[in-house]
């Protein structure tokens, strides 16, 4: 028996709900629904936020040309493109290995570039970014 793929996009004035792809192949089907509202330009990024199966501590570039963030702790369709002020800040002090750091460090970085943790406990969370 062959496969049938459907693409359904419904757009309203305030949002668009995309359902894609719907593949009907014998007895199985897959449906993914994502709701995106128009960008909220004056909103504030919420970190960390949950999107699909991940938790994000900084702006992401998932299915977009530019980095964006969620305006809710769990993504509910409200978002905005990130500006320089929106990116996650370093958390000080943070714990790395057996030391507490009060500023960016190059410890453990192969190329000597300074970095910081985005949570208080790098050993547990392993979330970081390079320092500017």
Swiss-Prot record:
Keyword rRNA processing: no
Signal peptide interval: 1-17
Residue ranges of every copy of the Fibronectin type-II domain listed in the record: 40-84, 85-132
Protein location: Secreted
GO molecular function terms listed in the Swiss-Prot or TrEMBL record: heparin binding
UniProt keywords, alphabetically: Disulfide bond, Fertilization, Glycoprotein, Repeat, Secreted, Signal
Cited Gene3D superfamilies: Fibronectin, type II, collagen-binding
GO biological process per UniProt: single fertilization; sperm capacitation
An annotated GO cellular component: extracellular region
Top-level division of the source organism's lineage: Eukaryota
Disulfide-bonded cysteines: 45-69, 59-82, 90-116, 104-131
Tissue: Expressed only in the epididymis.
Record InterPro entries: FN_type2_dom, FN_type2_sf, Kringle-like, SP_Capacitation_Regulator
Entry-listed glycosylation sites: 53
Function: Binds sperm in vitro and promotes sperm capacitation. Specifically promotes capacitation induced by high density lipoproteins (HDLs). Also binds heparin, phospholipid liposomes, and weakly to gelatin. Does not bind chondroitin sulfate B.
PANTHER family per record: BINDER OF SPERM PROTEIN HOMOLOG 1, SEMINAL PLASMA PROTEIN
Family to which this protein belongs: Belongs to the seminal plasma protein family.
Protein name: Binder of sperm protein homolog 1
Annotated source species: Homo sapiens
């Amino acid at each position: 028996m062959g496969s049938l793929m459907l693409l359904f996009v419904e757009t309203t004035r305030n949002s668009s709900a995309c359902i894609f792809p719907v593949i009907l192949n014998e007895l199985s089907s897959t449906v993914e629904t994502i709701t995106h509202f128009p960008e909220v330009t004056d909103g504030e990024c919420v970190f960390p936020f949950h999107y699909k199966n991940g938790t994000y501590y900084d702006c992401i570039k998932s299915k977009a040309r530019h980095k964006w963030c969620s305006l809710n702790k769990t993504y509910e369709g409200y978002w905005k493109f990130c500006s320089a002020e929106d990116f996650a800040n370093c958390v000080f002090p943070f714990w790395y290995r057996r030391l507490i750091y009060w500023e960016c460090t190059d410890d453990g970085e192969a190329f000597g570039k300074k970095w910081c943790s985005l949570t208080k406990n790098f050993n547990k969370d392993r979330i970081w970014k390079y320092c500017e």
